[in-house]
Amino acid sequence: MWKNDSLVGIQNLLLQDRLGKAVTMFENYLLTYPQRFDTGQLIDIKNNYQLLVDYWRKGFDDPRRNQLYKELSRRLFVLLNNVLLTDRMAHSSFFMQSYQHSSVFRRSFSISGLKASLESFVTNIAMLELEPEHLRQSRKSQLYAEHQQLQSNLFDYLITSEAMTDWQKDEFLDLLLSPTVDSFDQQLIVSALMLSAMMSFDMNKFHLLTSVYRLTTDEQLRQRALVGWVFAADAAKASLYPEMHEIVSQLCSDEQCLNELTELQIQIVYCMQADNDSQTIKSEIMPDLIKGNNIRITRQGIVEMEEDKLEDILHPDSTERNMERMEASMRKMADMQRRGSDIYFAGFSQMKRFPFFSTASNWFLPFYPQHPGIAHIWNQSKGQRFLHLITSLGAFCDSDKYSFVLAFEQVLSHLPAQMLQMVENGEATPMAIGGEVPNEEQSKPAFMRRMYLQNLYRFFRLYSYRSEFINPFESSLAIIFSNKLFNGTPLEAHFPEVVSFLMKRKMQREAISVLQNISEQQRGFQYYLVMGQLRLAQKVNDGLSATACFKEALALEPDNEQALRGYARSLYSEQRYDEALDAFERLLSLKPDNRSIELNVAVCLIDLKRYDEALKLLYKLNYEEADDERVNRVLAWCLTLLGKYEQALKIYESLLASDKPSADDLLNNAFCLWFKKDVAGAENLFRRLLSQQADSEFSLENELLVVEHALLLEHGLTDIDIHLMLDLLAA
């Protein structure tokens, strides 16, 4: 994606309140390109700034000085963003094409004129009922064709528009709340405003999106506005626009908004994991779906197979079992969909190469059958009922509905004739793999939002010019709960739910970013406990360490077993074995005779080279449960370090008896043999280990020369011995 480092640097100066330096650097930049930029506005800002400085130097006490300084900073920021937009178009074929495509529209554009055109379209469509029937269809097609061209021009105009003025914001709000303008047009405008504000922050566009979210009664529009203002909310700009905090705080005072933001965050994560879900469907669900049907997918399409009578004789219950597996797979897929998984992404991602999707606005249009790009297919007689039913009953986002209609002629030719005939005759109803979605479900805000997010996800993943945009699903924007604008708001009460969800999805780093956004006064025991667990698992070094987090938790609840266990483990991971031993022994005093804790005590004793004490405890644990592999593993290693090789080897023989022994057991057994001077035996085990770990990042050289180097030297081996072994294994 295009980036102008010089202009971004000037923007950062403004965000640091360095107005004077920003003016100077911006002036130098504009003078470098005098043929491309008009310096008139900058000169006016510079003169006003100089006037402010002159009054300040003379010692005048101006009560409006700070306000004027901020106003000039904002004016410069707006001018800077407009120059950034011009520069972007000069370096981007997509934005230049969008600008040129809407050039005629741009020259005559006015919001009042736009509103009149949109209202006229609604009126003209309503008046079609008065047209003679033989003229109605052609007139209808003409109206929709003209309107689609208007939509495309409007979209291109908005995504290449400069900063919005206050009066433009008010006029657009009036248009977006007007009941006389089609909701589909309003939804498209909101999407375009979102894209524009994401590319170049505009306070008025952000404010407009929040106002639409608060005031509209159209739920589809409301959900688009929600996604729009959340993705456009750039906390870094709050130093220039502190009213952003006030706007967001006001929104977060509403419980419905808090619930919707929480749902939105979870839905965004499900979109981000579409590839993983697609792989699950491909490997775990589709095989059973196909096996459970008497169909086969061939190059010629879906073929109905005759029943295998011999199979029925040999395995009379196989059909029933296959059917049960198929139904279970269907339920699993429907459950994934209900939870929020994007189950159709992989399939429909192959259907975005139609020319229809080369027009950017088409990715954001709500689905309507009269769209000139699909109307001729929608109205065809063959397979019409099948097409209409499948698009209305399945949980398809608008983008996928357009894809399905465009690909329908190909789909139709691959459907079994008998299946199609039954549907067309009303004898059967087609059902999407994810199951039918009742109208009641489709009318819920969460469903509407999920479908819109899937539209966006497809655009940012599949559109041919996607690299020209900031992808909110691949950047820090995706974890909206880490946005600093939500810090200190009532939304913090919902942070634990999102953190728990992220942890279950193995997204520890993202969970940490949410926890870090909790305000200091809200950081209690649970905060430090979870943060400690995350940092211990992720080994993240920024901010408080895992040990420090658990220590804070214990200061609040000294005898909490979870916190004490985490504290002990984190100390051990930092190789602070004596402190870890104290923590584990303290934990053992709270939970006497806990084998897991006793084993940890033994491990700490070994690392402190208190082998005899460790051995005594390990023998006790082994006596109580002789088949406990965890205990036997540590016992064998302790015996090895004590030089009791024969006893250790007997235990290793048992541990290595499994089909796939652990890498640690292979390595430690090899060390035991090597210390015993059985070089050939050690070599054999090292080779087994390397073979087993061939597809991993394991490095035996690193183990011998770095991780365990000191240990090897302590037990009589030399650097020459180590190099000879490595050379032998490499030969």
Predicted region positions:
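Short coil turns that delineate tetratricopeptide repeat
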Residues: 34, 522-523, 558, 592, ...
